[in-house]
Design a protein with these regions (language model features):
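Bacterial N-terminal signal peptides
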Residues: 4-16
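Boundary/activation segment at the start of structured domains
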Residues: 16-135, 382-412, 489
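Acidic, glycine-anchored loop motifs typical of Ca2+
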Residues: 44, 88, 245-251
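Cysteine protease catalytic core and zymogen-processing segment of caspase-like enzymes
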Residues: 47-53, 93, 106-109, 114, ...
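Solvent-exposed, polar/charged alpha-helical surfaces in well-ordered, non-transmembrane soluble domains
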Residues: 51-58, 62, 93-100, 146, ...
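Acidic, divalent-cation-chelating loop motifs in proteins
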Residues: 240-244
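Pro/Ala/Gly-rich low-complexity, hydrophilic intrinsically disordered segments
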Residues: 256-432
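Short, flexible helix-coil boundary/hinge motifs
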Residues: 402-489, 496-511
Length: 511
């Protein structure tokens, strides 16, 4: 009986741990307007910042406990996003109101023992003031660097906060004030530098996902009807970046996914600068866990046969772009019970995926190709974006050469094998089929010649005349040798085909 209290305590602890959950809260802001002041005041209005915020909000509604969106959607956006009715103005006043609401929810969830994760997303104009400090444009003013770090982020007391910004000069938001504010392309080593990380020293629970582009056309794209970075980010968070198949998208995975998405864009006007920094305290925290997603269907399986493909919903919103490596199984979240369009450069098909059962990519067939006219820059984006294959092989190479502070996911525990180990042995298999065909034809020929030889041997046995006997013997020997030769070719071809079918390169076998 003396062990009963300990048993009760253990059961209580187990119960409390079982009840603990991961709670996501999301705040998405999108504003198309131009800044009232600053070096970017001459910039034109954006077209899709409101769409960006609503696209993030649409995904957040399926995985978050609460999602708030601040935007001024135009009529076209309202028609494409049913959740437009939930928007509030993207102003400092509404931002502070949303922070108060979400802060209270986060505090309650934390008190209940939940592990709280927060998304803070912004899309719009970024600009630099006369002192070189970064600002984000809102309808009633500016969200300054100081307000962001000293007021906004501290008001979101989650275990981890994921700061996602799609704006010009976004990278200046994490630079110390003594670092030049000139927008430059950031290499992996520069992203890893202490000068870029020092801004987050007092916020070690905050991770950063940012992008800026050399011009507005690269920042936004009519094909996507959203910002390019936002679309790439959401393609990854919907499951495209989940390289080890555990349902969680971590920072190293999304960084590799973004790198692959932009790798083949050769036109510098169309190239994004992306920056991904994981929270210092939790480098392997998940940005999203798709396993508990609600009101969604899943497209699953190996999709390499589709090449570079895209998924659009029934209202024309681009949900995902991806080009999967050979053998890489993907698991993509899509709306349940409504038509979605799956397409690539050669064709398309409409699918209605159900929440209670996944749809397998390998069961999908496309038809009806289509083409469109395009400009040089648009052509560069269409050829380059998502042209590189993504999967375990690309991910492994990326993390090996990237920021050493980036903590990679464990691929061995997931059962996911590197694509290099599963590369299609297409040439060997084609040669094997050819060898098998020769073996089959030779076997048939051997049988025919053997039959002819048997008939000639019968003629030889049944005749008593010298000349017919000699002729029958010659036929018998000729057909016999032909049968033996064909049989030998068949055996050798069959053996060669077997070897080719099971052949692996020495380097792959060693792996």
């Amino acid at each position: 009986m003396r062990h009963v209290p300990f048993l009760v305590l253990a059961l209580g602890l187990a119960s409390s741990q079982a009840q603990a959950a991961t709670a996501l809260f999301s705040l998405a802001i999108g504003y198309n307007g131009v800044p009232a002041e600053g070096s970017a005041s001459g910039a034109g209005s954006l077209n899709f910042a409101d769409d960006d915020a609503l696209a993030v909000h649409e995904l957040a509604r399926t995985v978050a406990r609460r999602s708030v969106v601040l935007a001024l959607p135009d009529r076209a956006t309202q028609a494409r996003y049913p959740s437009s009715s939930e928007t509030r103005p993207p102003s400092l006043v509404e931002l502070r109101r949303a922070l108060a609401t979400l802060g209270a929810d986060i505090t309650r969830a934390t008190a209940a023992g939940d592990e709280v994760t927060v998304w803070f997303f912004y899309s719009g104009h970024g600009w630099l003031d006369s002192d070189g400090r970064a600002n984000l444009t809102l309808a009633d003013g500016a969200l300054s660097q100081d307000v962001l770090y000293n007021e906004v982020l501290p008001a979101l007391p989650g275990r981890t906060v994921h700061l996602m910004i799609d704006a010009c000069h976004a990278e200046a938001l994490i630079r110390p004030r003594d670092v030049t504010a000139e927008t430059v392309e950031l290499s992996a080593s520069e992203v890893a530098s202490a000068s870029l990380r020092s801004r987050l020293e007092h916020l070690p629970n905050v991770g950063v996902l940012m992008a800026s582009a050399s011009n507005t056309q690269a920042h936004e794209w009519d094909d996507y009807q959203t910002g390019v970075f936002t679309h790439e980010l959401l393609s990854g968070l919907r499951g495209g970046a989940d390289v080890n198949g555990d349902g969680r998208v971590e920072y190293s995975e999304i960084a590799a996914f973004l790198a692959a998405a932009n790798r083949e864009v050769t036109d510098p006007r169309a190239r994004l600068t992306t920056l991904v920094v994981a929270p210092k305290l939790y480098p392997r925290v998940a940005i999203v866990d798709t396993r508990g997603a609600r009101d969604v269907a899943r497209l699953q399986g190996r999709a390499h046969h589709l090449g570079r493909f895209q998924i659009d919903d029934q209202r024309g919103n681009r949900l995902v772009d991806l080009r999967a490596e050979f053998g890489f199984p993907v698991d993509i979240l899509v709306p349940a019970g409504e038509p979605i369009l799956l397409s690539n450069e050669s064709g398309e098909t409409t699918i209605i995926a159900q929440a209670d059962r996944p749809t397998n990519f390998e069961d999908v067939s496309l038809e009806k190709a289509h083409t469109r006219a395009r400009s040089a820059m648009v052509d560069a984006m269409r050829r380059g974006l998502f042209a590189a294959e993504f999967g375990p092989s690309y991910y492994g190479g990326f993390v090996d050469s990237a920021d050493k502070q980036m903590v990679p996911v464990d691929l061995s525990a997931s059962g996911v094998r590197f694509a290099a180990e599963e590369q299609p042995r297409t040439a060997h298999r084609r040669a094997a089929w050819s060898a098998f065909a020769v073996a089959g034809a030779s076997t048939v020929a051997a049988g025919i010649f053997a039959g002819l030889a048997a008939r000639a041997y019968g003629d030889f046995q049944n005749t008593s005349l010298e000349r017919p006997s000699i002729a029958a013997r010659d036929r018998y020997e000729s057909y016999g040798y032909a049968a033996l030769g064909a049989a030998a070719v068949g055996v050798l071809s069959g053996a060669l085909g077997y070897w080719l079918w099971h052949h692996r390169d020495d380097a792959r076998s060693a792996n």
